[in-house]
C-alpha cells in the first residue's frame, strides 16, 4: 500500500497546501485498486500533478460533509465522464452524501456515463473484498464524521517446494492445491497435507485514516496496532482548547494517541493555514517529542505502508 497526499491544509487552501485529499494506491501486477479518501476543492487538479489517472479510481471514501473534504467531488465525477471513462466507481460516506452528489449533478445538468454507486454508511465494517476490509469509526466533530481502518487479510505462507520435491511430489497443479492448504493423495497412496509444508501466514498491513476529530472514544480501537496512522494536527499544544472546541485535535493529542495505540508510524496532516513552513516544523517537533516516529505530510508526499 502507498499513500499519496494530494491536500494537507485545514479549512482553506494555502499557496503550498491544498485542502484534504489522500490517495491510497493498491495497484499491483495482479490486482487493481486506487482509492481516494476525501475530495476537497481542487483535488482533480492536484491529481494532474501525479502519475495517477482519475479513471483508475474505483472507490472514494468521504469522512464528512464539510466543504474542505467534499467540494472537489462533483467536478471529479463529471471529469471522469468527459474523459470517456467507463470504469465503475463507488462512493462511501455519511448520511447526506447521496443527496449532495445527486443534487450537484442535477442542478448543473451533469451526469455520469459510468456506473456510480453511492453507499451511505454507519459505524462498522463497510467493505470486504477478500483481500482487505474497511471499517468505519465515528469521530468527534460537529458533523457526522468517520475515520477508516483499512486492513489487509493475512497472506498464505510460502510453500516449501524443496521439501515437497524431496517427498516425491511432482511440481505442477498439485503444488497449487497444497498451497491452498488442501490434502492430496499421491499415486503410491500417500496423503500429503499442504498445511505441513506451508510457512506461517504473512500478516497483512493495517492503516488508520482519521477524519476530522477531537478526542473520541473510538480513536484507540481505530488506531490500535496499525502500521501507519494518519491523523490531523490542526493546532499546536498551546491552542489545544481551541482545537477541541471546534472538533479538532492538537499535536499533543495526535501523538499521545499514536503512542497509546502502539502504531508503527504517525503521519500528521490537516494543518491550520496559520502555520507557514517554520510553523509546520514546530508542529512536527511537538509531535516527535511525544512520539518520535512522526512524519509531516506535505502536498504530493508519498509514504509506503
UniProtKB/Swiss-Prot annotation:
Enzyme Commission (EC) number: 3.1.-.-
Cofactor note: Binds 2 Zn(2+) ions.
Function: Zinc phosphodiesterase, which has both exoribonuclease and endoribonuclease activities.
Keyword annotations from UniProtKB, A to Z: Endonuclease, Exonuclease, Hydrolase, Metal-binding, Nuclease, tRNA processing, Zinc
Lineage, uppermost ranks: Bacteria, Pseudomonadati, Pseudomonadota, Gammaproteobacteria, Enterobacterales
Organism: Escherichia coli O127:H6 (strain E2348/69 / EPEC)
Cofactor(s) required, per the database record: Zn(2+)
Protein's recorded name: Ribonuclease BN
Family that this chain belongs to: Belongs to the RNase Z family. RNase BN subfamily.
Binding site for Zn(2+) 1: 64, 66, 141, 212
SUPFAM superfamilies assigned: Metallo-hydrolase/oxidoreductase
CDD domains recorded: RNaseZ_ZiPD-like_MBL-fold (cd07717)
Active site residues according to the UniProt entry: 68
InterPro entries with a match to the protein in the record: Metallo-B-lactamas (IPR001279), RibonucZ/Hydroxyglut_hydro (IPR036866), Rnase_BN (IPR013469), RNase_Z/BN (IPR013471)
EC class of the enzyme, as a word: hydrolase
Molecular-function annotations in GO: 3'-tRNA processing endoribonuclease activity; exonuclease activity; zinc ion binding
Keyword Metal-binding: yes
Any matching Pfam family: Lactamase_B_2
Oligomeric form and interacting partners: Homodimer.
Residues that, per the record, bind Zn(2+) 2: 68-69, 212, 270
Alphabetized SMART domains for the sequence: Lactamase_B
Amino acid at each position: 500500500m502507498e499513500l499519496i497526499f494530494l491536500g494537507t491544509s485545514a479549512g482553506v487552501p494555502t499557496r503550498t497546501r491544498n485542502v484534504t485529499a489522500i490517495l491510497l494506491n493498491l495497484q499491483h501486477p495482479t490486482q487493481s485498486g486506487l482509492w481516494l479518501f476525501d475530495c476537497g476543492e481542487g483535488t482533480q487538479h492536484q491529481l494532474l500533478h501525479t502519475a495517477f489517472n482519475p479513471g483508475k479510481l474505483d472507490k472514494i471514501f468521504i469522512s464528512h460533509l464539510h466543504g474542505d473534504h467534499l467540494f472537489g467531488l462533483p467536478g471529479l465525477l463529471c471529469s471522469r465522464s468527459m474523459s470517456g471513462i467507463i470504469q465503475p466507481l463507488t462512493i462511501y460516506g455519511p448520511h447526506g452524501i447521496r443527496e449532495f452528489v445527486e443534487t450537484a449533478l442535477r442542478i448543473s445538468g451533469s451526469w455520469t456515463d459510468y456506473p456510480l454507486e453511492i453507499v451511505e454508511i454507519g459505524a462498522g465494517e463497510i467493505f470486504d473484498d477478500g483481500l482487505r476490509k474497511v471499517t468505519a469509526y465515528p469521530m468527534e466533530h460537529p458533523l457526522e464524521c468517520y475515520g477508516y481502518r483499512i486492513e489487509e487479510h493475512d497472506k498464505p505462507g510460502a510453500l516449501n517446494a524443496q521439501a515437497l520435491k524431496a517427498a516425491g511430489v511432482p511440481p505442477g497443479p498439485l503444488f497449487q492445491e497444497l498451497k491452498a492448504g488442501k490434502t492430496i493423495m499421491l499415486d503410491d497412496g500417500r496423503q500429503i497435507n499442504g498445511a505441513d509444508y506451508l510457512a506461517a501466514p504473512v500478516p497483512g498491513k493495517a492503516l488508520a485514516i482519521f477524519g476530522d476529530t477531537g478526542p473520541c472514544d473510538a480513536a484507540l480501537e481505530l488506531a490500535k496496532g496499525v502500521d501507519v496512522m494518519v491523523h490531523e494536527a490542526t493546532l499546536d499544544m498551546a491552542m489545544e482548547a481551541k482545537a477541541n472546541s471546534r472538533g479538532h485535535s492538537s499535536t499533543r493529542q495526535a501523538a499521545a494517541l499514536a503512542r497509546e495505540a502502539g502504531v508503527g508510524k504517525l503521519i500528521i496532516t490537516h494543518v491550520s493555514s496559520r502555520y507557514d513552513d517554520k510553523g509546520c516544523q514546530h508542529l512536527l517537533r511537538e509531535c516527535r517529542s511525544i512520539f518520535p516516529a512522526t512524519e509531516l505530510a506535505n502536498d504530493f508526499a508519498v509514504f509506503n505502508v
